[in-house]
Amino acid sequence: MHDAQRIASETVDAFNAHDESRMRELYAEDVVFEAPGDVHLTGRDAAVEYAMSWLRAFPDGGMRVHSEIVAGDWVVHEFTFSGTHDAPLQGPEAEIPATHRRPEGRGVEVLQVRAGKVAADHLYFDQVQVLTQLGLMPEPAAAG
């Protein structure tokens, strides 16, 4: 297995195990992390805290990787995240109280691995889908 692929796989495993210390080992000190909601973070502590905030809010949360592309030091995962929203989630604007709903949605994560550490992590998912499944936005109107 390619080094970048191994590190990316271990990152998913650490996330699914809710293993904060392992995530800290896998991320570079100066990792650049981006996510929907205009989230732009620099540094291991901030990136791991973002992940842990989701895992605290979704205590049974995890991701299933459906496909993976490896190109040099880049790894792309297409995944599905699901979990039960049983604790508050800190959003970019405000805290979202627990809804006790179980959203499930697809996303893409683009990781760059350098010197055996995740140097960049760019996360993409449909915020409207998540908020709708949590009951915080109305269902979109049917096309027609």
Task: Describe these PLM feature segments.
Residues 1-144:
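C-terminal and inter-domain tail/linker signature
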